[in-house]
Amino acid sequence: MALRKRSPHGLGFLCCFGGSDLPEIDLRDSHPLQYLEFSGPIPNPEELNVRFAELVDELDLTDKNREAVFALPPEKKWQIYCSKRKEQEDPNKLATSWPEYYIDRINAMAAMQNLYETEDEETDKRNQVVEDLKTALRTQPMRFVTRFIDLEGLTCLLNFLRGMDHTTCESRIHTSLIGCIKALMNNSQGRAHVLAQPEAISIIAQSLRTENSKTKVAVLEILGAVCLVPGGHKKVLQAMLHYQAYAAERTRFQTLLNELDRSLGRYRDEVNLKTAIMSFINAVLNAGAGEDNLEFRLHLRYEFLMLGIQPVIDKLRQHENAILDKHLDFFEMVRNEDDLELARRFDMVHIDTKSASQMFELIHKKLKHTEAYPCLLSVLHHCLQMPYKRNGGYFQQWQLLDRILQQIVLQDERGVDPDLAPLENFNVKNIVNMLINENEVKQWRDQAEKFRKEHMELMSRLERKERECETKTLEKEEMMRTLNKMKDKLARESQELRQARGQVAELVARHNESSTGPVSSPPPPGGPLTLSSSRTTNDLPPPPPPLPFDSCPPPPAPPLPPGGPPIPPGAPPCFSSGPPPSHDPFSSNEAPLRKKRIPQPSHPLKSFNWVKLNEERVSGTVWNEIDDSQVFRILDLEDFEKMFSAYQRHQACMQEGPQRERGNVRDGGAASRPLPAVEASAHRTEKASRSMVSATGAKKELGSTEDIYITSRKVKELSVIDGRRAQNCIILLSKLKLSNDEIRQAILRMDEQEDLAKDMLEQLLKFIPEKSDIDLLEEHKHEIERMARADRFLYEMSRIDHYQQRLQALFFKKKFQERLAEAKPKVEAILLASRELTLSQRLKQMLEVVLAIGNFMNKGQRGGAYGFRVASLNKIADTKSSIDRNISLLHYLIMILEKHFPDILNMPSELKHLSEAAKVNLAELEKEVSILRRGLRAVEVELEYQRHQARDPNDKFVPVMSDFITVSSFSFSELEDQLNEARDKFAKALTHFGEQESKMQPDEFFGIFDTFLQAFLEARQDLEAMRRRKEEDERRARMEFMLKEQREKERWQRQRKVLAGGALEESGEFDDLVSALRSGEVFDKDLSKFKRNRKRPGSQVPEVTRERAINRLNY
């Protein structure tokens, strides 16, 4: 028997599927090899053609191959005919030339496989039988295949596959059996018979449940090829549904996705399997109903996306296999094309199918003015009534709605469903019967509600205790920190006091020696001596009167400092009758500014619209330390002139739209903060109190809604308070869940047990009894038992001495740390941001480069600058390149820094606090500090009053508030000192950059730099994105060239094989289909079409591709 050649379609690709192994040749014939001798002379051409046609009919060749073999010369035809006839008449092969032999052997193997454990030798013999059958089905005449079908040979194979044990399933026998079915399907009659069997494809799909990768590859090749055969696509989908139940999959295709993501450890087997899976996925998506049905492709692809195929595809790119990448490219290209087509239906560029709001808006827009709009409203209305709680069968009911909609979308005009998955084996009645009995649900719900109430009560008590413990702990920690700070400050001030006393004594002695008459010691230089502690001040003797100096010494000889170097230049002058010497912060005795040497461009350039800094303001600033002449030696000025030439669309560039505004919020104090306790309650509205109405309170307790209702029904109830105010007060008391006496005790004890939360205290401040209320209540105090709930509460609270001041002090105490914590970060942000800007060397270098660029671009009044206003930084992006409108001067600046000054790119890491400082409004911050100051003063006044009053044993106001004042006063003084330091640092930062202190606030100054840094980072991202797009375009072009070259090579090899005369020994058309599916040639036409569409002018596919890259993260 002549060796059969492999299909040319598989050359170069079958190795990826494990199908390239050459058949094992075993010469067991005892006869020696002989030369082929013709049995007779060549008959006449007519007779030869008749005999040859009979042989060709038995081989069941395709029309293309029939034409090729009939075109052979007569000698070749006669040689082939004689060879086949001799092979058929060989007596040594008589036993195995009939299908009955193989059917009997396979039936016997099926019956005996479960009786005893087979050895390796027996397994090899059985495998050889199946292999021989596979060879016979491929090489024997057509009558062999026909008789095999008539004798129910296919049923024999399917029964064996259905009933084989685990050992056989994992053996080579399983792979050979799948090969037999594949060989049977390699001709038209066998293929039709397999497709006619109702369970054939489903049983073949069961073979996916094995660990043998070669078996899986063979099964997937059959299923993928069947998808391409008319009528086969739907059978494959049914087979995958059958496999879902057979393998207990959660969803269809779950096993395939797991295998696609799993690593086998062997590169060859892994790539073969993953390529087979991807070829099958592409076939099932694009064949059958997927050829021209967009809805079907979107529906089926959504299953794969929900299973997480997109991250797996990204992972598969790491294998760098050409065939596998080809299938991956086809999957993504078809997906992008379908998404674009769906978006076109709604006049969109891309639809985010993960966004429910966007999809709803599109549907609403499409149906708003159609007769279907009421139906949409009805659907939404009934969806609102669907169950949402996680109990019963709520999920199944939503799933039913989903599958019904899927079925509506997929059904064609004839009512045929291309996919039975949505409602396959889904019985609505069974789902409804699975719901839990309503009575049982009610019983458990009542019990759960009882436990919930008990739980809430315990949680309330626990939270109250936790708040108490937390408050005490915080107060203790704050007191310890304050105590340590006070000790340090006391030691520091004691040391300063000793030094000051020594200085005073020394100055007095010097003065007594140098003058006659009664004189007194002058104050220390730098102003009068000030001490922060009143206690240490009392220990000092009264200061002597100042000396009657007529004038200060001249500047070269300043007053002698106390035991140290001369007074710094910034110190205030001594008392003098003459005018003080003028001091200009920008004036200096430094050398004059060096002359600018700026290279001249060969032609006019676009201008950088900066605000030039006056030369007299440069001294003493950062600009005095900058030498931009060094930058000109590094810059590529010729390239710069090309990029920013003024001749190319100069006006269009200069008149571009206004500068893009940043979304920085610098409202600093926009959020309203509660006034201190001293100013609260009198001006509060009752609108907030009405918002406290709640539906809770079914429990009958003091202040509950039911109690309020019953109280309001009493006939003899006395009320003198305004009705609405009384109602709001009752609602507040019901939320407090405390009696009047408990509230009174909590206020007297300054809420030691944390019964009154901060928000409740804020509400209580709105219900302080006024003078008119107190007078009316006093008139009816003998009828206190008849008073309404609100009236009695106000009356009892009015009996507390200074109730309003106590309540305000308690509220201020609870809010103090919170307000202090809000103010401190703002002060620190100004302080740190000022330091960072002043000390940043990278910012200084960047300004040097910008100054050089601006001087090179600008002429006339704007040129020759020694510095510029910092606000000009945000105008860099306004100047666009003459060559590319997408490139601005800011982009070009970053390219210069990347090339010559890469360290400057780390500038944002030095300026970490700019964004916070840019949000600080200094006026609002000072207002917050002033509120704290007035609040502390009001508490001190009330504390002084309470100290002189007779106290109730339960009254804790004096001890609690004394400790609070001690700690909070020290903390507040620290905040004030820090704020003063921040003001000083900010003023120095303004001077450092040549700005005027009186004309710029922190939010504006820091906002300029913050906006620039954001634009700087965005420009870097733009450049990086441009580079990535360029690399992607180059990679795609290389890939397309390689694919085109590979297809040409394969096409040339196939033509060469056909011309060589081996067409008769090629495999059949089903093998051709499998090979084309393997290599991806079946999708070449669609790939070329997609690529052509993508290259069309104005195509929006690249935009969709970018959107797709983002959406990959969602799956």
UniProtKB/Swiss-Prot annotation:
Keyword Coiled coil tagged: yes
Biased composition (Pro residues): 540-583
Coiled-coil stretches noted in the UniProt entry, renumbered to this chain: 434-515
Residues annotated as domain FH2: 595-1042
GO molecular function: actin binding; small GTPase binding
Residues of the GBD/FH3 domain: 40-416
Superkingdom of origin: Eukaryota
InterPro entries: ARM-like, ARM-type_fold, DAD_dom, FH2_Formin, FH2_Formin_sf, FH3_dom, Formin_Homology, GBD/FH3_dom
A Pfam family assignment: Drf_FH3
Region (Disordered): 510-605, 655-697
Deletion phenotype: Conditional knockout mice lacking Daam2 in myocardial cells do not show any heart defects. Conditional knockout mice lacking Daam1 and Daam2 in myocardial cells show cardiomyopathy, which is stronger than with a single Daam1 deletion.
Cysteines joined through disulfide linkages: none
Tissues expressing this chain: In early embryogenesis, expression is confined to embryonic ectoderm. Highly dynamic expression in later stages of gastrulation. In early somite stages, detected in posterior node and persists until 9-10 somites have developed when expression is concentrated in the chordoneural hinge. During organogenesis, expressed in the CNS, PNS, liver primordia, limb buds and genital tubercle.
Boundaries of every FH1 domain copy: 518-694
Subunit note: Interacts with DVL3. Interacts with INF2.
Comment, domains: The DAD domain regulates activation via by an autoinhibitory interaction with the GBD/FH3 domain. This autoinhibition is released upon competitive binding of an activated GTPase. The release of DAD allows the FH2 domain to then nucleate and elongate nonbranched actin filaments.
Protein name: Disheveled-associated activator of morphogenesis 2
Organism: Mus musculus
Gene: Daam2
